[in-house]
Amino acid sequence: MKLTPTKLKLLIEEVINEAAKGAQDLPEDVYVKVFEYRNRIYVMFTDEAGEQIDPVDLDTGEDNPVWGEVSFVEEDRKNPCDKSAVIAVTEVSDGWGPFLYDIAIEIATKRSNGLTPDRFIVSPQARKVWDYYDTKRDDVESFQLDNEEDSFRNGKQDDCGQESSRRDTIINGGEWSDSPLSRRYTKESTILDSLGDKLIWEL
């Protein structure tokens, strides 16, 4: 079978779909902790006591299947970004990135005006997730942000750094505004509501 660009895109979407996890997939001893530290909001996998889960079990030396965190700042330091929060750091085990992103978007929707990707560098894996939000997720809304130069000439309120979007066009083509990294995203709190006693909320 010849692997055309269209077929490759479909395969990538299938992998993302299959790998993505939900609250029902959390191991019995894994929880989700949400807290603020040094002006960042953290969404982190922890144990029942709220202690961070490391990639490797220090007692056994074996890999932990579920670990990681997503953090974001509630406002960009340089640009308004339409009052959206901005991703800061993402480190997460395979298959669990979209789950933590979903929660981060839900929190940012409640507290800010949604969430936008890192404004400078986004990994290829994270870029696929944002593209999936932008094109395939009916439960996630995307809103176009302007660039630092107010290219849309609609005022500065939605101006946002677009370095990651411009970098994206080098690989994927198009204009910076075609990139899924150029937008902010909002989502209803369905994942947060589904966590029940698995959620350790400290905001």
Located regions from the model:
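Terminal substrate-recognition subdomain of acyl/acetyltransferases
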Residues: A19-R38, M44, P65-N79, T109-L203
